[in-house]
Regions:
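Active-site neighborhoods and metal-handling regions in enzymes and metal-associated proteins
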Residues: 1-457
Length: 457
């Protein structure tokens, strides 16, 4: 039974430190992608990046082009070219793979110097593309339409696609993002080093969320609370949310100076590489503080939702098909009644939502090394929302041992989180479930009472 009771909140984790990706990890990434290219008969990949859509590029290069655009051209023999704008050209020799720099000022900011007499096509000709027979274009989206040829949907800027088509008129062009984030894509699983790398951001998001929830008080502004949702100078991978009362007034999506009032609906979100934390509830401390027409919020929305989170955590396991997890959530939280529409769980990495093996009729296998977000979003008419979106990592016995040996401090944090979730929240976890933050599954629906949270009795 789901109960709202008083107990100690999770520990605020200190001494969080970033873990860099090793040279061995970067070499492994490159080789696994080259193997995928061979399997699918690609002569080369052209991988696009901008700040928001650059994770496939960053996966191999180690950096994002910030305010510019960029291309990585990777041939099946391992030869690589970095096509860069004015202010990223100096990053080529800093990249995590050996690549020849090619300057394309067209990728720079508007009105910056265009000191070239060459067209986009002529610049791309420096990347040894003319004799390729099959080219994979990689943006950020693995299309899954049932009505179109997904291999012919390209999410790169037209000026680049057009130049490739003109330069290589006889080549087959395909969307190849699937090699990265589709079923069995190279980015869908992580080694011990990658887990440690991503755990830092996920843990930081959890700490930020716990600190922010502790700052919620009547009369405080959204901005005052939102100050806690950023930390250590780290870049967010989602828009920070701290909203009280009605949302999206005059289309605003950012925290502002609106103050918290009793009975307000509250929404908070923060995220970094490796994981996001989101919370939804009310600015109340007890049922009697809720608006009259919403006094059954706990039984109508919040408790069924938390039961779905419990079910998700207790059901997910290595080797199950995505549809099995999807059906479990549909069983305990029917879409028709609770209004959720998206995948109840997705993979995370540098970006908050990378892809998802969890969907109707999915035969994709959930595997060791997958970094998951518990993302279930009910929408019940007449009530505010509820959320405790957070993350876990799946690791088989061998991967767990590798993490324990290489990163004992992180392993210790993980064990403390597991103990809290099982002993305080009452949720049973398989050995393969590694919570990525101390806030995972912790939910205070009445946010003015900082001692009340859901548990399973």
């Amino acid at each position: 039974m789901i109960q709202l009771t008083k107990f100690n909140p999770p520990t605020l984790e200190e001494n969080l430190r970033p873990v860099g990706l090793t040279d061995d990890t970067m070499a492994q990434r490159r080789q696994e992608l080259l193997d995928k290219m061979t399997q699918d008969n690609f002569d080369c990949l052209i991988i696009y990046a901008d700040l928001e859509h650059g994770s496939n590029f960053e996966y191999l290069t180690g950096f994002l082009p910030r305010f510019e655009e960029a291309l990585l051209v990777l041939h099946k023999d391992g030869k690589a070219y970095l096509v860069l704008g004015n202010e990223n050209l100096n990053k080529a020799d800093k990249a995590r793979l050996k690549a020849e720099a090619v300057h394309m000022p067209h990728l720079s900011l508007p009105n910056q110097p265009m000191n070239t007499q060459e067209t986009v096509e002529e610049i791309l000709s420096q990347c040894d593309l003319e004799h390729t027979q099959k080219i994979g274009l990689v943006g950020w989206k693995n299309f899954t339409s049932t009505k179109e040829d997904n291999y012919q949907l390209f999410d790169l800027p037209h000026f680049l696609v057009h130049a490739v088509q003109s330069l290589c008129p006889k080549a087959i062009l395909e969307n190849a993002t699937r090699l990265f984030i589709g079923e069995n894509g190279v980015r869908t699983t992580n080694n011990a080093n990658e887990f440690a790398h991503y755990e830092f951001g996920a843990a930081l998001a959890g700490r930020c969320m716990l600190n922010a929830m502790n700052q919620i008080e009547l009369g405080k502004s959204e901005m005052e609370v939102a100050r806690e949702l950023s930390d250590l100078g780290q870049a967010h991978n989602v828009v920070t949310i701290m909203a009280t009362g009605e949302r999206f007034v005059k289309a605003n999506i950012y925290p502002n100076d609106k103050v918290i009032k009793k009975g307000d609906k509250l929404s908070l979100t923060t995220g970094y590489k490796g994981g996001l934390q989101s919370r939804g509830g009310y600015a109340v401390s007890q049922v009697s503080d809720l608006p009259d027409e919403e006094k059954d919020y706990l039984s109508a929305v919040a408790k069924p939702y938390f039961n779905a989170v419990k079910t998700w955590l207790e059901a997910i396991k290595i080797g199950m098909q995505g549809q099995e997890l999807y059906n479990k959530i549909e069983e305990v939280l029917p879409q028709e009644k609770y209004g959720w529409t998206l995948n109840p769980g997705h993979l995370s990495a540098d970006e908050e939502w990378m892809s998802s093996p969890v969907y109707p009729q999915s035969t994709e296998s959930i595997g060791s090394g997958m970094l998951f977000q518990i993302d279930i979003i009910p929408s019940v008419s007449g009530y505010g929302g509820v959320s405790c979106e957070s993350g876990i990592f799946l690791a088989d016995a061998q991967l767990r041992q590798e993490i324990k040996e290489a990163y004992p401090d992180i392993w210790g944090r993980v064990q403390e989180r597991r103990a809290y979730i099982q002993n305080e929240l009452g949720i049973t976890l398989r050995d393969e479930i590694l919570p990525t933050s101390s806030a995972t599954a912790y939910l205070r629906p009445f946010m003015l009472d900082k001692t009340l949270a859901f548990t399973v009795k």
